[in-house]
Amino acid sequence: MQEGNFLLSALQPETGVCSLALPSDLQLDRRGAEGPEADRLRAARVQEQVRARLLQLGQQSRHNGSAELDGSAESARGMPRGQYHTMQTGFSSRSQGMSGDKTSTFRPIAKPAYSPASWSSRSAVDLTCSRRLSSAHNGGSAFGAVGYGGTQPTPPMPTRPVSFHERGGAASRADYDTLSLRSLRLGPGGLDDRYSVVSEQLEPAAASTYRAYAYERQASSGSSRAGGLDWPEATEGPPSRTIRAPAMRTLQRFQSSHRSRGGTGSVSGAGLEPVARAPSVRSLSLSLADSGHLPDVRGLDSYTGHRTLQRLSSGFDDIDLPSAVKYLMASDPNLQVLGAAYIQHRCYSDAAAKKQARSLQAVPRLVKLFNHANQEVQRHATGAMRNLIYDNVDNKLALVEENGIFELLRTLREQDDELRKNVTGILWNLSSSDHLKDRLARDTLEQLTDLVLSPLSGAGGPPLIQQNASEAEIFYNATGFLRNLSSASQATRQKMRECHGLVDALVTYINHALDVGKCEDKSVENAVCVLRNLSYRLYDEMPPSALQRLEGRGRRDMAGAPPGEMVGCFTPQSRRLRELPLTADALTFAEVSKDPKGLEWLWSPQIVGLYNRLLQRCELNRHTTEAAAGALQNITAGDRRWAGVLSRLALEQERILNPLLDRVRTADHNQLRSLTGLIRNLSRNARNKDEMSTKVVSHLIEKLPGSVGEKCPPAEVLVNIIAVLNNLVVASPIAARDLLYFDGLRKLVFIKKKRDSPDSEKSSRAASSLLANLWQYSKLHRDFRAKGYRKEDFLGP
């Protein structure tokens, strides 16, 4: 049996040969005993042995004055090292806590009693001690509740703490000190959209209680700034857990090497990489002196050859930012790592430190380390830059001016997930600056698509099976970067549409997420928002040749032709003629590729089905559904023929109206903008307005305010709702009847008379137009008067 699979008992034996293993049923000749009674007796015997053993341990700990058993006590008992043949020499039952200090691992806890349900002969391993060790370094007593940015007290144990990344197993412990912190999901909140048909980005000041790593989570489509509690993925771990950032881990590694030189406990199959010994103060000064940059290290004269500095005995608290910047120019990679880690730590949330670092020329020196021969230096340099430019426009400009974009794209070619996470995070941070978006789009789109989007979406090769955690974060950062760029200028949108493979990668990823049930994923949200933004003003910005093809190659739309120009055997009111528009729409699908590529996806009939699936299946992430509705609003907007074709396709083939109305019932104001805008477009192009009126009118009237105290949606939503009702009332008497029946007149009159702001003026004018059209139904005048309304209410100012 391999050592990694050998499970030791957590109950410490009295002597070296003691064991709590029970005789087998064969040995007791109880194989054929009465089943339940035999199990009960065996469980009772186990409980008695456990209780007696715990009592002995409790007495022994009180007698010794401590619950810890040191190595000398172990040897005094004469525990034979070679008793268990499956164990290697030096492994003891106390080493399973994975701590570096053998004397502080096992802490027996006296428990009063145990029921048969809580103990058995197979439950001997008590993990309480192991949990206590790990919790001390993940939000526990070692750092308290201050988080990463707080002051780090002196850890009680002299050995290096077990980090959050080490708990995942041997594979995740390979790069213990160089792993960058996994960015957690930002939660959504409220941010007003300025446009009804374009996704916008989040303000740089957006904050979250789950933002354990400082960088811009800029987002489009009205993404918000509230805490992360309303996004379910943010609750993967305990909310109170403190996660140490890479800079803190590096500083603590150097600190740990100064405090203790003791060996760590054996870990089965751990395979930890040997960590280079932290340089002494003398080696620091000599190395920097060789390079011509001698730092001002306080207390240097107090150094002796056999002890470290007393001022540094508690860690590297005496390092300042100027010294850390000078370390970046050292020839020793250890010094460069230390300097970058300190800058990363200081610039986490300190605006003054970011400004000071820029004045000390930290930005150009970090850029030179992006493609260093030592990968650990690369990781810490990019991690430091990621914090340095967060919410700091001047540092972003300095990075771009130092040819940082070119160096970042070179680094992106490295096959190291930690580096790629940092690089894509830096690009996302840069994209939050409006004046950098056009340049970023020009310099990065093609390489980012080839190196990240296509491989990780499955569009550029074999089908995507599943992304690992690092790949998921890399793709998330990349789509967040695109989400910001897509909300920029028309030229940037056009460049993104024409970028080979970009739209294909996004559509492929969304389809895959829907197939595997991950439509709530934040990367899906980013991808849908990008498609929404790229669909903005699509028919005005698309290639003329494609637009001509969508308009029917010069063929007249029979639905809009005057009756006198119709040639054929059918009268204008015949059933055959009414069916012609549907046939014409079906024929136009032959003019669109059945296998769309690139920007063809944006107006393809297949994309309507994709958005409809998102509306039906995405229940939790409201930003995804808002973006899907906004994208449909974009491609059905305007007077273009193809907008009408896609509107009728959504209504008649995709049956999208019921999912939309379900969303309207529970939608917030941001969602209502997109949903009501889409329904407005559909109501213009619907063939059967009577059927649509029966489904829509009652739901929309519920959203209208009828008095001063009632909750009122934004003016833009009110205008959309009134426009939908107007489109239906003009063509359908059923809509006028339902509007009267569901008390819509009272609400419309209230909106018409409310003119206390510029926004309410817009909704008042819309209500006046609708009331005037209602008065045209003379058969309803008696019903109007019966409810107390006069002609002046409909036609008056």
UniProtKB/Swiss-Prot annotation:
One of its GO terms (molecular function) is enzyme binding. Pfam families: Arm. Disruption phenotype: Knockout mice are viable, produced at the expected Mendelian ratio and appeared normal at birth. Increase in protein abundance of Pkp1, Pkp2, Cdh1, Ctnna1 and Ctnnb1, and decrease in Jup protein abundance in the epidermis of newborn mice. Delayed hair growth at P7, as a result of misaligned anterior-posterior polarity in hair follicles that show shortened inner root sheath and hair shafts with densely packed medullas lacking normal airspaces at P8. Residues 516-797 are annotated as: Required for binding to PKP2 mRNA. Belongs to the beta-catenin family. GO terms for cellular component: adherens junction; cell-cell junction; cornified envelope; cytoplasm; desmosome; nucleoplasm; nucleus; spot adherens junction. Residues 283-288 are annotated as: Required for interaction with SFN. The record marks 285 as: Interacts with SFN. It comes from the Eukaryota. The gene is Pkp3. Residues 58-81, 219-241, 253-274 are annotated as: Disordered. This is Plakophilin-3. SMART domains: ARM. It is found in: Nucleus; Cell junction, Desmosome; Cytoplasm; Cell membrane. GO terms for biological process: actin cytoskeleton organization; desmosome assembly; desmosome organization; epithelial cell-cell adhesion; epithelial structure maintenance; negative regulation of mRNA catabolic process; positive regulation of cell adhesion; positive regulation of cell cycle G1/S phase transition. The modification Phosphotyrosine is found at residue 195. It is a peripheral membrane protein. The modification Phosphoserine is found at residues 123, 180, 183, 240, 285, 313-314, 331. A component of desmosome cell-cell junctions which are required for positive regulation of cellular adhesion. Required for the localization of DSG2, DSP and PKP2 to mature desmosome junctions. May also play a role in the maintenance of DSG3 protein abundance in keratinocytes. Required for the formation of DSP-containing desmosome precursors in the cytoplasm during desmosome assembly. Also regulates the accumulation of CDH1 to mature desmosome junctions, via cAMP-dependent signaling and its interaction with activated RAP1A. Gene3D superfamilies: Leucine-rich Repeat Variant.
